[in-house]
Amino acid sequence: MLIQFSKMHGLGNDFVVVDGVTQKVFFNAETLKRLGDRHFGIGFDQLLLVEPPYDPDLDFHYRIFNADGSEVQQCGNGARCFARFVRLKGLTNKDRIAVSTVSGRIVLQLEDNDQVTVNMGVPEFEPAKIPFRALKAEKLYLLRVAEQTVMCGVVSMGNPHCVIEVPSVKDAPVETLGPKLESFDRFPERINVGFMEVVSASEINLRVYERGAGETLACGTGACAAVVVGIQQEKLKGRVKVNLPGGSLYISWNGPGSPVYMTGPAEHVFDGQIEL
């Protein structure tokens, strides 16, 4: 079966985006691994699938798959690319696009200059809903991982995140501590790990080790999680600039019960077709 796809990226976090509205597609884990291979396939951090809406009040359903074949609940950089894709392909003429994901609903707003603002929803701190094994919600947790003590904030942005403050992201133990925390037994569904350097109350540097993908050039939900944790711990406030290896995002959050807003770019690279 021949399928059409687009290659896109948000700050270097790269995606294969597939229209599942006008073409019939089905991906199993084996196919996803083959397509995700950067030497023998197309290569991507995630594959994004556009599906018809499950609810008449929504415009589309948004599914996200990692290159290891696993399906994930949320991807902020992918959401921005999703919004640009459905407009570029004529699947909608709206600037405000409401979609469902595995973890809930999000709203995408197309701005000028290829920027997209995403209402990422309300962050979840309740351990059982993250999921995270803890007696109660705390602003800061102490974890004993691989014979070292780690202080971190834990939150779900539709997917689970652990955020650690570091003196410098340049020297952060992303490749060593990242995978150990990702599979730590107190995170039953594994976790994304953010290493945050606070520059000022309105700016941070961030590196993210993503669950199922390793370190990526940018992680939208990771940026949201880091800002939420920083605001909760009174280290950040207002609109925060998040500097990632691939570029910068702007994150806003007004506190508990409020949604997180993320603004950043979405770039279309090329279109192609491949035999499944």
Swiss-Prot record:
Swiss-Prot/TrEMBL GO biological process terms: lysine biosynthetic process via diaminopimelate
Catalytic residue positions: 75, 219
Reactions catalysed according to its record: (2S,6S)-2,6-diaminopimelate = meso-2,6-diaminopimelate
Pfam families linked to this entry: DAP_epimerase
SUPFAM superfamilies cross-referenced by the UniProt entry: Diaminopimelate epimerase-like
Pathway: Amino-acid biosynthesis; L-lysine biosynthesis via DAP pathway; DL-2,6-diaminopimelate from LL-2,6-diaminopimelate: step 1/1
InterPro entries associated with the record: DAP_epimerase_AS, DAP_epimerase_DapF
Gene3D superfamilies given in the database record: Diaminopimelate Epimerase, Chain A, domain 1
Positions of disulphide bridges: none
Binding locations of substrate: 13, 46, 66, 76-77, 159, 192, 210-211, 220-221
Cellular component aspect of the GO annotation: cytosol
EC number: 5.1.1.7
Site note Important for dimerization, residues: 270
Subcellular location: Cytoplasm
The entry's keywords: Amino-acid biosynthesis, Cytoplasm, Isomerase, Lysine biosynthesis
One Gene Ontology MF term: diaminopimelate epimerase activity
Annotated site residue numbers, Could be important to modulate the pK values of the two catalytic cysteine residues: 161, 210
Similarity remark: Belongs to the diaminopimelate epimerase family.
NCBIfam families in UniProt: DapF
Quaternary structure and partners: Homodimer.
Function field: Catalyzes the stereoinversion of LL-2,6-diaminopimelate (L,L-DAP) to meso-diaminopimelate (meso-DAP), a precursor of L-lysine and an essential component of the bacterial peptidoglycan.
Listed name of the protein: Diaminopimelate epimerase
Lineage per the UniProt record: Bacteria, Pseudomonadati, Pseudomonadota, Gammaproteobacteria, Aeromonadales
